Amino acid sequence: MKLQVLDTKGNEIKEIALNDYVWGIEPHQQAIYDTVISQQAALRQGTKKVKTRAEVSGGGRKPWKQKGTGRARQGSIRAPQWKGGGVTFGPTPDINYKKSVNKKVRALAFRSVLSLKVKENNLVIVDKFDFAKPSTKEMVVVMKNLKIDDQKTLIVTKEKEELVVKSSNNITGVKTISANQLNVFDLLNATKLLITEEAAIAVEEVYA
């Protein structure tokens, strides 16, 4: 397929030929779902911890005799029904939340989301950013020129470009990453994908 490449003023300056295998497939919803779940699960740190009845402080003896008091029988003040007692089936840090997805499914999900951006006209390719210094004002102007200033946008450059990152940091709803950091969740979380020509080629080389 061929798509237009714009300059930062919003002018069409040339066409770029992109591989249909990466940018033009029918989106596979299950692959997308599985990959997002896997990515989110990997972020869970598993740092929550509560004490069981074996770990809380308190005596192990019976608080009162079994019969004759008129009260319900109790075995220990560390039992879960007591205030300050242990927690039953509480969270522990040894739980492995990881959900594995094989490379083929992950790649299919990636191509599916990229194709979805093209299909929904939410992909904008720019030739390059040419900031002389960090400038939020200039980035806002660029986004207005590209008609994406009111959209949640993911900006992707081939390498990390500090001037682009610093220029977009203070703009609500805008995130900037390099091509090797691109992931399915960030793509789905943004309405518009603003990618440089170099970054688009780099992404295609990985997934073609």
From Swiss-Prot:
Part of the 50S ribosomal subunit. Residues 50-83 are annotated as: Disordered. The gene is rplD. Keywords: Ribonucleoprotein, Ribosomal protein, RNA-binding, rRNA-binding. Belongs to the universal ribosomal protein uL4 family. It comes from the Bacteria. The keyword Iron does not apply. Pfam families: Ribosomal_L4. One of its GO terms (cellular component) is ribosome. It comes from Mycoplasma capricolum subsp. capricolum (strain California kid / ATCC 27343 / NCTC 10154). This is Large ribosomal subunit protein uL4.
